[in-house]
Regions:
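C-terminal motif of bacterial Sec signal peptides marking the signal peptidase cleavage site
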Residues: 13-15
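Accessory terminal helices/loops
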Residues: 20-36, 147-154, 160-167, 172-173, ...
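Active-site metal-binding motif and surrounding structural segment of the metallo-beta-lactamase
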Residues: 41, 46, 71-72, 83-130, ...
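Conserved beta-strand hairpin/beta-sheet module of binuclear metal-dependent hydrolase folds
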Residues: 43-96, 219-232
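Metallo-beta-lactamase
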Residues: 48, 73, 80-82, 137-209, 254-266, ...
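Active-site neighborhood of phospho(di)ester-bond hydrolases with catalytic His/Asp-centered motifs
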Residues: 76-78, 99-109, 130-133, 229-231, ...
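Feature captures hydrophobic
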Residues: 387, 393-399, 403-406, 410, ...
Length: 566
């Protein structure tokens, strides 16, 4: 019971490391020239405009914006860590050091919210923290039930465990910097549903809900400045209509509508949350091209779906028209048309592609065994893998290695060949998400690979997170083998007056708010329980000290908690 429940790994992804062996092989760098040139988009600097708008680019994956007011300033998007926010503000404050009156989150992603505590704690008078009404819920999802898998896949996509020399950029920024600095998320204290018009420090500000890259996305419109802050709904690369780290379905039609709302305002300035700013006629032209690219992919996917084509087929059939694809704003340095097509299909029809062969397919091990028989045996299948790697037919090599690994055949040799294939593809990938994901996956196949250690979570961060999320996580952490035949009800009575109850039965954990027929009644504070579950406190010592009062059932309570550990 001494180990942490590790509820918050995504928050603490490490930045690129210089300590590992460089995975990249010698290749013709001409292949990567366009991606290398794309890094110029993230040259570190603050762009300042005469109207009091300032955009910090290149200090991390996301931009941060300062708007000067009469007696104070407004921060739009707060960077991905306290340290990064501090660096950005060291430049902002040289321009104008008036107090921060408000922090606005354009959406829930950590690179826009996790540096907020730095600005929040600068002065005794605390600023407003403004966001869409659903943002805090989505922040908690980042740290919630899918945290382990999203954390791992995010680490791969952003290359956080790769040597710094392998990460050319991450498509919408130079790198993901959440790592060595404390996380400083502050829960919003002003929220809205559809729109909010407010004057802050003499600045008229209009906020509009604008679903797109996230469902909680908003954009900021400054009518007197004619300035638009679109959040992550537009940046200088094809959008992530689907992200390979994993995400709920992104409503592409709503994304287009949000961009049309922005276009209707006819802005003179565009200050995005990723990549460089635009001004003048280029703003409206770019917004139009961007929305047209998204609509084209959506509409043509639907057209081909209705003709009976599968996601894989459609992903190879759709190409942007030349008048759209010529724009630098739809180069595939983040999202791709191919991945977007599959996500759109899944969003409308779900995972089943309509082919009966795929409704209840053979298990992978059974398929691999039959493939080996067709090949003349497992050794012949292995020889085919060797030949595929030698001939640089690497995607076929990956498919063959899948089958050999399913058969547990020559595991070490198969993994080595698989690693070579993954690395070959990754080294030559122009899309940073694909490149980093492949090179990270190759790194994980090293015999001495160890996942980066987690940095400790803080009490300050936990205080911003709802206790409900912890109980949701406990529900999905239940180990069914440990819960066989168990019927038990544990009630939690918090000093806030809140009641939570977990009932174990049929190898599930039901969470409710009923304090009846309790086998164990636990009395404590929400914060203490959160700290114990997250590893800030040692659970055993916290129970032994009485900070978690179990009514004399310490051993039974610790045994109960053990059922939620692997």
């Amino acid at each position: 019971m001494k180990k942490s429940f590790f509820l918050f790994t995504l928050v603490f992804l490490l930045g690129c490391s210089d300590s590992k062996d460089d995975l990249s092989r010698e290749i013709d760098t001409v292949i990567l020239d366009d991606l290398i040139q794309h890094s110029n988009e993230f040259d570190k600097r603050v762009y300042s405009f005469d109207n009091g708008l300032h955009l910090a680019v290149g200090y991390g994956i996301a931009n941060s914006i300062m708007v000067e007011g009469i007696d104070g300033n407004i921060i739009i998007d707060a960077s991905d860590s306290v340290a990064e926010a501090e660096e950005v503000y060291s430049h902002f404050s040289k321009i104008n050091s008036n107090p921060i009156k408000a922090i606005i989150y354009t959406h829930n992603h950590g690179d826009h919210t996790f540096g907020a505590a730095y600005y929040y704690n600068l002065d005794e008078e605390k600023p407003m923290v403004i966001a869409h009404e659903s943002t805090s819920e989505y922040v908690e999802r980042i740290m919630g039930i899918l945290n382990p898998i999203i954390s791992k896949r995010s680490s791969r996509m952003f290359g956080t465990e790769l040597p710094s020399g392998d990460v050319i950029n991450v498509g919408i920024g130079p790198y993901l910097g959440v790592s060595q600095s404390p996380i400083g998320y502050i829960k919003p204290n002003i929220t809205f549903t559809d729109e909010l018009k407010i004057n802050i420090a003499g600045v008229d500000i209009e906020l509009y809900h604008a679903p797109g890259e996230t469902n909680d996305q908003l954009f900021v419109w400054l009518p007197k400045h004619r300035a638009l802050m679109p959040g992550d709904n537009i940046y200088r690369t094809f959008p992530n209509l689907y992200t390979i780290r994993g995400t709920p379905h992104r409503d592409v039609k709503s994304w287009v509508k949000s961009l049309d709302h922005m276009r209707s305002l006819k802005p003179d300035y565009l200050l995005p949350s990723h990549t460089k700013p635009l001004e003048g006629e280029e703003v409206l032209e770019t917004l139009t091209i961007y929305r047209d690219a998204i609509q084209f992919v959506h509409d043509q996917t639907i057209r081909l779906m209705n003709k009976g084509h599968s996601p894989d087929e459609i992903s190879h059939m759709i190409q942007l028209p030349p008048e759209v694809s010529s724009s630098p704003f739809v180069r595939e340095f983040y999202g791709t048309v191919r991945w977007s097509v599959k996500s759109i299909f899944n969003g409308y029809l779900g995972w089943f592609d309509g082919n009966v062969s795929n409704l209840d397919p053979l298990p992978s091990e059974d398929y691999a065994r039959r493939l080996a028989i067709l090949s003349g045996g497992e050794e012949k299948l292995f020889e085919a893998l060797q030949k595929a790697v030698e001939s640089e037919d690497m995607q076929w090599a990956l498919r063959l290695s899948d089958s050999l690994l399913a058969l547990n055949y020559k595991i070490d040799s198969t993994k080595k060949l698989r690693q070579e294939a993954i690395q070959y593809i990754g080294d030559r990938a122009l899309n940073p998400n694909k490149r980093n994901y492949f090179l990270s996956s190759a790194n994980e196949l090293n015999a001495n690979y160890q996942a980066e250690p987690l940095l400790p979570q803080t009490s300050e961060l936990l205080s911003e997170i709802s206790i409900d999320m912890f109980f949701d996580i406990l529900s999905v952490r239940l180990n069914p083998e440990k819960a066989k035949g168990i019927k038990q009800r544990v009630c939690f009575e918090f000093d806030s007056g809140n009641i939570k109850t977990i009932t174990l039965r049929n190898q599930i954990a039901e969470v409710s708010s009923e304090k009846t027929n309790c086998d164990i009644l636990v009395k404590t504070s929400e914060q203490i329980l959160k700290e114990a579950l997250a590893g800030v406190r040692n659970p055993i010592m916290t129970v032994a000290s009485g900070d978690i009062d179990t009514g004399g059932q310490r051993t039974n309570f610790l045994n109960f908690l053990s059922k939620f550990a692997e």
